[in-house]
């Protein structure tokens, strides 16, 4: 009789453990299904209610960055570029693609360096001006009243009035067709102290970045979710691969 009671207690304990920890055995796919609470589709054509447009740039939004460089005579220049992105993590590299017709293309080739000046929405007039006119015809700093500052680590100017700056040394470039993609290693990042949180991140409550798409500029980004709050950590790790 005593053995029977012990056996029942052991079985009850096993059942309790399975009930408490059974969810831990979920695969990432199972976790994702529970996350969205919708049945996963077995097949999808990917064309339902969509119109084929052929080859067309529908990437939106794109960052509106102002690229700083010196020409061969040492004149500071800036231009607005949206064909920009992060190219690598370690070492941290960014890329910007420019047409050979642009003045900045030749400036970067001459100096082997450039800066990335990240604008706030309050600076949109300067962003538009830098993207509309060529440095061949004028000194854009003189025309706009912006202040060029010689970078500490690379041979390129940055814009004092812009809140975030990346100093980049040119490490390689690739001719892709209409554009040359410049890859720059970031050797220093600068930010206005008022925008810096204690954890070293940008305070997005105080910073209103500019994005570009379809010939227009936009601002007013709004936080909708934190990735670590919306996706289980184990699944999150898999999504990053």
Residue spans for each PLM region:
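Basic, polyanion-binding surface patches
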Residues: 8, 19-20, 24-241
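N-terminal Sec-pathway targeting helices
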Residues: 1-14
């Amino acid at each position: 009789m005593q053995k029977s009671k012990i056996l029942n207690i052991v079985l009850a304990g096993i059942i309790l453990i399975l009930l408490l920890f059974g969810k831990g055995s979920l695969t990432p796919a199972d976790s994702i299904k529970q996350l969205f609470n919708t049945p996963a589709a077995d097949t999808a054509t990917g064309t339902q209610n969509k119109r084929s447009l052929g080859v067309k740039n529908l990437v939106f939004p794109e960052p509106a960055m102002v690229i700083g460089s010196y020409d061969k005579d040492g004149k500071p220049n800036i231009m607005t570029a949206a064909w920009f992105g992060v190219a690598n993590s370690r070492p941290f590299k960014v890329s910007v693609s420019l047409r050979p017709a642009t003045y900045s293309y030749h400036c970067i080739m001459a100096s082997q360096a450039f800066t990335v000046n990240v604008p706030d929405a309050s600076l949109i007039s300067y962003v538009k001006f830098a993207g509309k006119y060529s440095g061949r015809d004028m000194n854009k700093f003189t025309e706009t009243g912006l202040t060029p500052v010689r970078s500490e680590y690379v041979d390129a100017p940055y814009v004092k009035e812009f809140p975030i700056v990346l100093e980049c040394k040119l490490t390689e470039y690739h001719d892709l067709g209409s554009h040359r993609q410049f890859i720059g290693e970031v050797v220093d990042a600068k930010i206005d102290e008022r925008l810096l949180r204690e954890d070293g991140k940008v305070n997005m409550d105080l910073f209103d970045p500019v994005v570009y798409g379809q010939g227009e500029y936009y601002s007013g980004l709004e936080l909708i979710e934190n990735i670590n709050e919306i996706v289980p950590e184990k699944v999150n790790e898999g999504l990053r691969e």
